[in-house]
């Protein structure tokens, strides 16, 4: 038995004797491909490192083992904030250069180009790609913002700082800090409050309001720093209760006087304690032992209990609304709503989402869902799950499962499949068992309700990754699309008018989403699936409709649950919601820029669902009895907290009695403002107060003081902004000198609060802060009638940090997963190609006495195996070849996904046109473009070499298919389906028509290269006596088995020397052969 070697590439190598028609050149291609892929793998890993700040040392160390003959000496030290490269031994760079590099990296600026000269000299050769300093900008400057705890002020520290400064302006600056940053509750004591009040001079600024409404002021400006907020609030109440008598009688603000505020605050504390006790009620256990005679009773009791709690919380919020903007009270309300949300989730049971039309599989999936995500209220499902499986008689469970592979979509339900086979809802997959997995193709819809498909993530994954749907299943997908459309219309679609947020409606929405299989955890899984999915132009329209509807539902639910986790009817949530929407918008739009219209629908719905605001009627009740100064202060305070104008409020600006400088000229005032700006004293602005009513003061102060300060601030990087004092100085100056510009002041305060309280920067926070900075610029332009543009360094540094965060959270996981999968696949394919090339070098001879095949290369015997094992190996190789043809398509998909991710980054960054002039941002864009180019080149190289592998493998596979077809002619199935006579006749025809081929001469030293691959291949096919892991499924016996074994089976014993058998006609002559075949030729 031989192979046709004449189609091999005409290439000479040192492994083979010179010959125009050489076999081993094909194998050499395998070696070349392996070496090329090792370089490709390294470049790919470097791309990953650039994108994700990964430890490049691993890439370098792996590279050492590759056939490049280069050993590099790099430091092993890597920190979270920068890459530590103290020396470059290959190029002779000294330690001082490394220190210089680290210093530059720490400062988040582009390091001195000279620092990288030597590094680039060897990295160019190593990377095998054109290198430049710019390409490493992203890699060496990417950093994350350190988490900073919120800075609450200590009242004792403020008092000590005022000992040497008793001017009204110093006290105004102190109150500004308190109102911006808040006081730590544990620092607020009766004695300190009295000491602070006693320092306030009468008839100055809003000091009289603080003196008269002391309890309200400190409750309004105090944050609960303890983890036990209720205890912290009780201690605060105890301290504030002692200063009741210190306020003057006959105060004007009826609802904010000390006695009234203390009374309401005490009522709030008692109500919260009562509600928290009720929220500890174990009503989720009501379904553990359902009443046999009335299965609906427990559900009714539970529903009534939920409605009772909702009504009490609603009443609590309404009754205490006048203090619901005091920071200490707001934090208590916020904490209560978090507790309520957690409580509601932990009372959700399987019975709540079970419906009469559910199929057997629906019920199993819902049991698993409820027990996985809400175990505390679903412990009873452990027994119910087992009983349900034991009592099932009408459904053949075997039809649910797939035994043919381990594709990605199958793995989404892997643990669930184990739970079914073990009949154990608590089972976990530890790799100890082999079992079939739940089907993910559309055939599973025969057992799964359309409205429950989101409980089956594997099915969703499968549909997303199809280009076409079989015609017989299009009706199923149409039903799914109709169901999605119904969900969008009934649960998601925005109403024509937005009512105030209703707790009852929000909890109903939680229930509806859980009913179809969506909670915050499953939404995150689906967001990840959708983020990694990339539709192609040739995708069938019905699948595109499915994808758009799915994205609409999943992203709406995802944003809803994030908002719900943070919800409370307070200004805290109102500001959180802005940030959440910007963060999620950035994620969706950067993944798919064409989804911007879809995002508007999602955000409109979320805004409508979580609609909270302040009304003018509330403000009138809030300020009842107050004078204009009171109302002005309270309005500005509310605006600073909420950040929006919900209703107009007009007030007059009182003239300060200190303002006595109308007679100075504009030039003199300009000089004074300039001197103040250039002063080293942070409080120098206080000297401008006497001039604040001069007709030209506002314009001059903005131009000479505010604009240069804003320019300086926006020219900082974000980490420098966090430690710089000038922004808070600017806020104090504007609060003192421009009291009527509350919008400008609000945005400055917001920027400052953001800079000190931010946990991390992402694309959402960048969008918000960009908006704030340009709103500051817009207000400056309106006041000065000029065109002012802020500097871009601050926004660019935030943007780069934001994209670092995006790359780490979304691109990095995808790359990590893809690299693992792709390179595992490539390595397997290379091994397969080497095996195929090795077999092509052999000559196969069959021994008809014992049906054994010996494989040789030249005169060297390589391996001997049974005919049965040989054919099984051939079949296995053909099967692997077909599987590789399918699986290798994922590499092209990976390329498309990654390049689109990078392209979307470039598109998104370029959309910030105001920042494009910034050099650092241009370097960032250039870097991503270069990375994208190198990714394309790398994938192109992979594609070219894979095609060469395929050509090589196709030669062998075609030969093996011919061999298998000869065997299949005489297979038991063929004989059973036709007749023995016709099979023998066809076999004879094939045998006669088969041609032999010329055997090429192979050099002796090639045998050692080929032999291991052939030996390994056929050793793995030897029968073994080891015990296989038993399938947990019971295999049903069938009666339609073939009544005889395959004629090539090893269990048939051939009779040797048949000519010696009695009365047996045997001869080797042509006549004898003709005698045997003639009756079959008709």
Swiss-Prot record:
Keywords: Host cytoplasm, Host Golgi apparatus, Host nucleus, Virion, Virion tegument. GO terms for biological process: virion assembly. It is found in: Virion tegument; Host cytoplasm; Host nucleus; Host Golgi apparatus, Host trans-Golgi network. One of its GO terms (cellular component) is viral tegument. The keyword Signal does not apply. Plays an essential role in cytoplasmic secondary envelopment during viral egress. Interacts with the capsid via the large tegument protein/LTP and participates in its transport to the host trans-Golgi network (TGN) where secondary envelopment occurs. Modulates tegumentation and capsid accumulation at the viral assembly complex. HAMAP family: HSV_ITP (MF_04043). Belongs to the herpesviridae inner tegument protein family. Interacts (via C-terminus) with the large tegument protein/LTP (via N-terminus). This is Inner tegument protein. It comes from Human herpesvirus 6B (strain Z29) (HHV-6 variant B).
């Amino acid at each position: 038995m031989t192979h046709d070697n004449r189609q091999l590439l005409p290439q000479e190598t040192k492994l083979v004797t010179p010959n125009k028609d050489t076999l081993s050149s094909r194998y050499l291609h395998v070696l070349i491909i392996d070496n090329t892929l090792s370089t490709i793998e390294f470049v790919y890993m470097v791309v990953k490192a650039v994108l994700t700040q990964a430890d490049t040392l691993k890439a370098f160390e792996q590279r050492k083992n590759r056939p490049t003959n280069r050993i590099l000496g790099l430091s092993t030290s890597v920190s979270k904030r920068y890459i530590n490269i103290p020396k470059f031994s290959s190029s002779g760079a000294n330690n001082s250069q490394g220190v210089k590099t680290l210093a530059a990296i720490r400062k988040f600026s582009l390091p001195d180009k000279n620092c990288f000269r030597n590094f680039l000299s060897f990295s160019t050769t190593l990377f095998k790609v054109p290198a430049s300093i710019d390409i490493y900008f992203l890699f060496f400057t990417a950093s994350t913002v350190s988490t900073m705890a919120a800075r609450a002020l200590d009242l004792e520290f403020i008092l000590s700082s005022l000992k040497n400064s008793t001017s009204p302006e110093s006290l105004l600056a102190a109150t500004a800090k308190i109102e911006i940053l808040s006081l730590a509750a544990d620092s607020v004591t009766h004695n300190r409050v009295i000491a602070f009040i006693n320092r306030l001079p009468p008839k100055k600024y809003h000091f009289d309001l603080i003196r008269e409404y002391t309890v309200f002021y400190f409750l309004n400006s105090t944050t609960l720093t303890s983890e036990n907020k209720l205890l912290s609030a009780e201690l605060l109440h105890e301290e504030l209760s002692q200063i009741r008598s210190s306020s003057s009688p006959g105060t004007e603000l009826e609802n904010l006087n000390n006695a009234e505020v203390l009374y309401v605050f005490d009522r709030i504390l008692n109500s919260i304690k009562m509600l928290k006790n009720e929220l500890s009620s174990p009503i989720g256990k009501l379904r553990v032992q359902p009443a046999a005679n009335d299965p609906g009773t427990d559900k009714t009791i539970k529903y009534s209990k939920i409605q009772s709690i909702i009504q009490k919380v609603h009443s609590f919020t309404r009754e205490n609304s006048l203090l619901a903007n005091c920071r200490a009270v707001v934090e208590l309300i916020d904490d209560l709503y978090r507790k309520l949300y957690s409580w509601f989730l932990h009372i959700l049971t399987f019975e709540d989402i079970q419906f009469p039309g559910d199929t057997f599989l629906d019920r199993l999936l819902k049991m698993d869902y409820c027990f996985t995500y809400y175990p505390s209220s679903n412990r009873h499902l452990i027994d119910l799950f087992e009983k349900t499986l034991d009592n099932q008689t009408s459904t053949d469970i075997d039809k649910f499962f797939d035994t043919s592979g381990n594709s990605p979509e199958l793995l989404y339900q892997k643990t669930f499949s184990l739970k079914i086979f073990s009949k154990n809802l608590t089972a976990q997959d530890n790799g100890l068992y082999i079992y079939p997995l739940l089907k993910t193709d559309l055939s599973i819809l025969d057992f799964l309700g359309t409205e429950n498909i989101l409980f089956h993530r594997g099915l969703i994954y499968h549909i997303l990754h199809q280009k076409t749907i079989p015609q017989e299943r299009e009706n199923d997908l149409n039903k799914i699309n109709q169901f999605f459309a119904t969900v969008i219309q009934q649960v998601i679609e925005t109403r024509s008018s937005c009512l105030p947020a209703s707790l009852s409606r929000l909890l109903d929405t939680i229930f509806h989403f859980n009913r179809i299989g969506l909670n915050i955890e499953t939404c995150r899984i689906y967001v990840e699936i959708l983020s990694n999915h990339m539709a192609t132009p040739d995708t069938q329209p019905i699948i595109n409709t499915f994808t758009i509807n799915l994205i609409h539902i999943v992203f709406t639910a995802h944003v809803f649950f994030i908002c719900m986790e943070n919800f409370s009817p307070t200004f805290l949530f109102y500001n959180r919601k802005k940030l959440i929407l910007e963060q999620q918008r950035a994620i969706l739009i950067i993944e798919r820029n064409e989804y911007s219209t879809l995002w508007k629908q999602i955000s409109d719905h979320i805004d409508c669902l979580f609609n909270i605001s302040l009304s003018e009627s509330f403000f009138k009740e809030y300020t009842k009895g107050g004078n204009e100064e009171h109302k002005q202060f309270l309005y500005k305070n509310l605006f600073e907290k909420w950040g929006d104008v919900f209703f107009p409020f007009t007030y007059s600006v009182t003239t300060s009695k200190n303002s006595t400088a109308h007679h100075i000229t504009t030039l003199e005032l300009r000089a004074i403002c300039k001197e103040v700006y250039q002063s080293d004293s942070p409080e120098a602005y206080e000297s401008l107060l006497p001039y604040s009513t001069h007709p030209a003061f506002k314009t001059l102060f903005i131009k000479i003081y505010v604009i240069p300060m804003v320019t300086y601030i926006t020219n900082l990087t974000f980490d420098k902004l966090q430690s710089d004092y000038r922004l808070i100085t600017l806020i104090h100056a504007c609060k003192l000198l421009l009291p009527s510009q509350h919008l400008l002041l609000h945005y400055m305060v917001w920027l400052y609060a953001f800079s000190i309280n931010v946990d991390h920067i992402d694309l959402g926070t960048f969008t918000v802060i960009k908006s704030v900075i340009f709103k500051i610029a817009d207000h400056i332009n309106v006041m000065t009638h000029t065109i002012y543009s802020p500097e871009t360094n601050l926004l660019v540094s935030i943007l780069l940090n934001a994209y670092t965060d995006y790359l780490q959270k979304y691109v990095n996981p995808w790359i990590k997963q893809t690299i693992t999968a792709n390179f595992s696949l490539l390595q397997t394919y290379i091994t397969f190609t080497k095996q195929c090339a090795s077999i092509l070098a052999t000559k196969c001879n069959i021994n008809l006495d014992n049906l054994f095949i010996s494989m040789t290369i030249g005169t060297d015997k390589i391996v001997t195996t049974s005919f049965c094992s040989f054919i099984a190996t051939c079949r296995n190789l053909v099967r692997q070849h077909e599987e590789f043809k399918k699986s290798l398509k994922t590499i092209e998909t990976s390329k498309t996904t990654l390049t689109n991710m990078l392209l979307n980054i470039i598109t998104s960054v370029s959309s910030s046109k105001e920042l494009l002039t910034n050099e650092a941002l241009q370097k960032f864009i250039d870097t991503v473009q270069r990375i994208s180019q190198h990714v394309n080149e790398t994938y192109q190289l992979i594609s070219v070499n894979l095609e060469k592998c395929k050509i090589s493998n196709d030669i062998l596979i075609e030969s093996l298919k011919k061999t298998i077809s000869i065997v299949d002619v005489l297979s038991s199935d063929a004989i059973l389906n036709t007749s023995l006579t016709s099979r023998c006749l066809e076999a004879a025809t094939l045998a006669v028509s088969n041609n032999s081929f010329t055997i090429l001469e192979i050099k002796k030293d090639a045998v050692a290269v080929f032999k291991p691959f052939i030996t390994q291949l056929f050793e793995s096919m030897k029968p073994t006596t080891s015990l296989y892991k038993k399938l947990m499924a019971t295999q049903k016996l069938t009666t339609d088995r073939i009544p005889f074994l395959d004629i090539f089976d090893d269990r048939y014993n051939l009779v040797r020397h048949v000519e010696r058998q009695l009365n047996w006609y045997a001869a080797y002559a042509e006549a004898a052969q003709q005698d045997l075949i003639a009756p079959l030729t008709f």
